[in-house]
């Protein structure tokens, strides 16, 4: 069984030492969904939401969150991200918004947590902006879709 990398021999949490690792190009994609009432989704899609452009705000929030992941998650390394992209798509037939994030860098540690944080915070921002009109929205299925680079190689989630 693979060992947890953030726990030392005494069972204490610690930050992994990556100083001896080689720099490689690393990329990760993650997704999240926000399920809502058709009326709420229509407010977003039509641009009629009283707080403004929900997707633009969520996109910027996701990008900012990726850059702050090291500050939010205690054992994450501060990273010099070379790319953060957050795409939002209204899926009207299913009354939900799909968020996909991509993070990339050339470095010694992966960007999975940054991609997951970007998608999660974008989803939270949608909730925050729309909670006045609907409080029972559901944020769900936050997951890593794919990652490349590094010692563990390529990972792709099953559809």
From Swiss-Prot:
Its EC number is 4.6.1.17. Homohexamer; trimer of dimers. The active site is at residue 128. SUPFAM superfamilies: Molybdenum cofactor biosynthesis protein C, MoaC. Catalyzes the conversion of (8S)-3',8-cyclo-7,8-dihydroguanosine 5'-triphosphate to cyclic pyranopterin monophosphate (cPMP). The keyword Acetylation does not apply. The gene is moaC. The keyword Lipid biosynthesis does not apply. One of its GO terms (molecular function) is GTP 3',8'-cyclase activity. Substrate binds at residues 75-77, 113-114. GO terms for biological process: Mo-molybdopterin cofactor biosynthetic process. It is an enzyme of class 4 (lyase). This is Cyclic pyranopterin monophosphate synthase. Gene3D superfamilies: Molybdopterin cofactor biosynthesis C (MoaC) domain. Keywords: Lyase, Molybdenum cofactor biosynthesis. Pathway: Cofactor biosynthesis; molybdopterin biosynthesis. Belongs to the MoaC family. Pfam families: MoaC. It comes from the Bacteria. Transmembrane segments: none annotated. It catalyses: (8S)-3',8-cyclo-7,8-dihydroguanosine 5'-triphosphate = cyclic pyranopterin phosphate + diphosphate.
